[in-house]
């Protein structure tokens, strides 16, 4: 398969989808059946081709997808992809309309984002699912402490069309041989999730963390660079680039 990004300057990359299929299957076997595999296909699947990589991942063991922006989710829906799609980025007014219309799962972490989504839901007369992002040490977006989690939950209680179905965080340093900070982040995440309703989808581990820390797999992992064959270590899975 040859991948050319829209509006590129004619450059292309020859992608071996058999390698991606192999990697997804290998990771799927390693995780076991109790852990969902979310394939991260943001940024045109890291330059590998959004649609073919997403389809290949879903055909070989991924149960859902993650993108950075709602526009990427819309492209997947237009290509016929019906699997759950999580938007990892922050809520914007325009993006909220797309997430609601296309049935995407939107990341939220503060009252402003929840209200923006509720307004879009009300205009379209349909609900939207959300996952609550918790910043446990990465230093990007996310509710950072119990007060911010309470504020987000209060906003959700006032937004009947915005439905909380999951929560997640991201390890800042998962490939560091010293795993003490990763363990600290995980403990902080688990403490904050005690404030949330039971039965949510919880995910903390991305590629390296999911392979290195079985204790961090919870009920979902996000696989990005691993499915493209280039984690810091393939942990004996013989992943193919």
Feature roles, as predicted:
Residues 1-105, 111, 163:
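A charged N-terminal "starter" segment
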């Amino acid at each position: 398969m040859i991948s050319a990004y829209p509006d590129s300057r004619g450059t292309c990359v020859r992608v071996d989808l058999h390698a991606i299929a192999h990697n997804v299957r290998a990771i799927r076997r390693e995780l076991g059946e109790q852990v969902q595999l979310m394939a991260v296909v943001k940024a045109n699947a890291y330059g590998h081709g959004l649609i073919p990589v997403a389809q290949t991942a879903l055909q070989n063991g991924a149960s859902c997808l993650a993108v950075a922006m709602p526009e990427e989710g819309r492209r997947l829906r237009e290509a016929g992809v019906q699997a759950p799609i999580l938007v990892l980025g922050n809520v914007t007014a325009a993006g909220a309309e797309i997430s609601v219309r296309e049935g995407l799962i939107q990341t939220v972490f503060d009252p402003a984002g929840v209200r923006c989504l509720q307004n879009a839901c009300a205009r379209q007369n349909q609900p939207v699912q959300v996952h609550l992002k918790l910043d446990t040490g990465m230093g990007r977006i996310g509710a950072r402490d119990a007060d911010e989690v309470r504020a987000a939950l209060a906003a959700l209680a006032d937004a009947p069309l915005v439905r909380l179905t999951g929560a997640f965080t991201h390890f800042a340093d998962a490939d560091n041989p010293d795993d003490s900070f990763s363990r600290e982040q995980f403990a902080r995440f688990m403490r904050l999730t005690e404030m949330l309703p039971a039965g949510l989808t919880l995910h903390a581990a991305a590629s390296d963390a999911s392979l290195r820390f079985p204790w961090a797999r919870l009920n979902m992992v996000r696989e990005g660079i691993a499915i493209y064959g280039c984690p810091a270590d393939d942990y004996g899975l013989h992943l193919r680039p």
